[in-house]
């Protein structure tokens, strides 16, 4: 028997079947770096319309975790897809470098500032530590395949950025938004510092819940108010609190003006409570025998005075809108030094903002004999004992509730009034303007808008001062006596900023006030406070975006971070930008959910359910991680586990195999000379290119909408259904057996070429390494990298007016599916081995029959059978299989007649009819020795 293998056009490519991503990706990265791929992209995109995604800076501390990977990969997908869409989209990664976590790390190794090192040396150590952390994280981010200006990132500790942060504060002061006050702020006794809203987390905590009686100073006045004369025992107003330790700072009792308050007689005394809460309070304190003596509106009780249960003063009843009937007694213990609501109402009534608690969380000397020097969290029992001793405690019980804790120490925090600097939300209309700006931003998902609106509407003034060593100094001078800011504050801040730009923040602490204040230096003191780190990152729209040359003065189009950043970076950026410029710093804000394990549980080292991105990249490769990120709906929680990553690897193999099939069958194809014009192509090939065109429209729309899981689903559908189970199957016969340079084969290769050109670009934003690899194997002249180009524009499709249009082939797909079912059953019944051993008769109603007949002898190639005949539906024999999908179709199968051709494997009657090629069929003889077969349709 002759060997006809050499006459076949067998697929061939150097593109490997196995990805071996973990091994290959580092080599690709090295090439990207050596070539300066990021620089090549920037040069290619110069002059295009811009799209600026401003990087929210991760904190320069510790290794990157899976959440960091999600964030950076999503950003990279957007940047690359925007590049392919014709934008110049520079990406400048950044890091947050000041603040407490770095201080704590340095303290652990070197001690607190002033112990072994001066404050200046301590800052230098912090800077050194942050730099090493940046280097470690940068390597991992690059390994993810994220393209950016990694050689020139922005760091909030860059001297120029530090200077620009000071300038941002100057602008806010110039616009009248800064004020100083002894306001209660979140205070961590372990950090010994104020905390920003975003540094507070909530955990369940068990606290004592107490009902306390404040006895009326003027008993007769109360009797008159309630219209009663006979009351058995003293009258008291009852408060309820879960923070007994704050009672030494009590300066009032808040009640609601419109609530009805009842005077209730119980055993030996009378108590005042909100009428609607009488029943629940009586149950709580264990009193079943009580009488309501009278009721009045809360407004009637305003400014009546009540004796503090153990301190030597009395306090007024005041009216507040914050009082509710949700719990308690309807009367709220008010300590202006320990709560924001209390502070606001205290200001209204001119109450003292008492703060008897020191920075370490212990009571200051002179607070109360048994409390001085005691930690507030240990003081509850002492306070409760005092109340019991004074006869003021009506009830005590334990309750579990959500309590604010320090994000760093996980320990409970307190509200503590300290002299601080604030950005005011209302004195110059910052709140109103911010709410207006929010409406002009596109929030993705859209629920983000309501979330941040609620936060802005209800947030207190922003405390921006910190009592820390490693941070950007506020750079302010205040008068020794009046504590007023220097009248030339803005000018002085610019002078400080210039020095910081040269020498870093240490320039402020080294500065002798006389150098810039001259003779006034004796009258002013330098403010020792540093800025909240959220001010550092929140001002990067000004300190970075406005000044980096690659952004060319354009504002950021997008901020993209985790959903916790509504109260973090999105908020601080909005506040600062609106306070500085009167407008939001972004046009779009996209948020992603947190990563959870396969069971939906929060990731935790203690549970052992964390997934290390480094491990995934070392085992499976970064492209698998990128594909998992893209295929997961980021608007909710993002589940990841070994099993989920394995599924991503399976999907990857399907895409890789499709790409490999395309490349292997483009062997020997030179698009410059072998391309077939669309009008001369086989109809099925034009249909396949049209499928790619339709897929591209969907994929580009999904990229534009940031629906990356939709991109992946559409890509998978294209590879698996439209190509894998239909087109690529059908063309194997023509591709392998037709004459190498025939129109039939070149038409097919032309289609594969167009499809490959489109596919490699669809993949590029997500499967960046694999797309780069595919790009290197594609035929034809091209730029060195897929990332410098744009979406492929060479796709075309069938016109609706053509007889064999898309609808025609969609119906053929269904017919093919029905035939496959019949063949599978015949194989199961051992009637045939493979589909080429079968011949089918399609009994079809006239309309469908006409379509099938139009394909002539080429129908069998579509059905992958050796024979295919069309007959009248009504002539179908009893054993013909009725289609469930196409009502006007029945399928009958028989074994194909004739012999099997060893070259094309089809069974035909003309095998051996040509003496010179006695072993092969007539079609193969034509392809081997003649002009080659002609294909028109398939």
Curated annotation (Swiss-Prot):
One of its GO terms (biological process) is isoleucyl-tRNA aminoacylation. L-isoleucyl-5'-AMP binds at residue 561. ATP binds at residue 605. A motif ('KMSKS' region) lies at residues 602-606. PROSITE patterns: AA_TRNA_LIGASE_I. Its cofactor is Zn(2+). Its EC number is 6.1.1.5. Its main location: cytoplasm. The keyword Transmembrane does not apply. The modification N6-acetyllysine is found at residue 183. It catalyses: tRNA(Ile) + L-isoleucine + ATP = L-isoleucyl-tRNA(Ile) + AMP + diphosphate. Binds 1 zinc ion per subunit. The keyword Cytoplasm applies. It is an enzyme of class 6 (ligase). GO terms for cellular component: cytosol. A motif ('HIGH' region) lies at residues 58-68. Pfam families: Anticodon_1 (PF08264), tRNA-synt_1 (PF00133), zf-FPG_IleRS (PF06827). Catalyzes the attachment of isoleucine to tRNA(Ile). As IleRS can inadvertently accommodate and process structurally similar amino acids such as valine, to avoid such errors it has two additional distinct tRNA(Ile)-dependent editing activities. One activity is designated as 'pretransfer' editing and involves the hydrolysis of activated Val-AMP. The other activity is designated 'posttransfer' editing and involves deacylation of mischarged Val-tRNA(Ile). NCBIfam families: ileS (TIGR00392). Belongs to the class-I aminoacyl-tRNA synthetase family. IleS type 1 subfamily. This is Isoleucine--tRNA ligase. It comes from Escherichia coli O6:H1 (strain CFT073 / ATCC 700928 / UPEC). The gene is ileS.
